Amino acid sequence: MEKFVSVTNPKVIENLKLQISNSRIIDWASDFNKDAGITYNRLAYILDYWKNKFSWEKSEKELNSFNQFYFIDEGIKTHFLHIKSPKKNALPLLLIHGWPGSIFEFFDLIPLLTNPKDNNLLGCQPFDIVIPSLPNVGFSFFTDQKPMDLVEISNHFLTLMKNLGYENYFVQGGDLGSFIASIMSKNDSKSVKGIHLNLLPLPRGLGKIPNNNEGKIYY
């Protein structure tokens, strides 16, 4: 594990804003309806937001308020947050974001999950939280740029939790994270004691009952 703190050169931000300023929205885009892709007005709003309203400095400061680390395994360098609850009865919980998405989705939940009592959530279970960025999202990347499928990502997160010393834990996944959480539970049901999904992955051909026993159980 490596400790991590995000430090961005201001020139990188200046260059990004310059590129946004030099962006040109083609005139005929204004004739498109939403079924043909992004509309002119929507794209203009996004460009203006990124140039004049979004503050990476503020977001980076918020990110750095949490404990961040790098986990390196077999050419995969995964950025993750690890926030421990002050409560002794806390249970470990892995939170997995979707795509497009990021670990920023969970920031508002962190104090509620790690210290519910002090946030007016009396009687709620506290958690020690692990929040990884998916491969090639944010500060996570492959050192050799080798693509990963969902099973490989799931196994990588199982290894991450094992290296953090968690023998038993819970997993929450949304969007793409739902698939990863489901695979983790299937591949290591001994360690993964329960999962919570924002999206329910369903097999293809749901109307047909599988012939094999494993398929019937999944159905």
Predicted regions and their residues:
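Coupling/switch/interface segments within P-loop NTPase motor domains and analogous charged loops
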Residues: 30-40
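Mature N-terminal segment immediately following signal peptide/propeptide cleavage
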Residues: 1-25
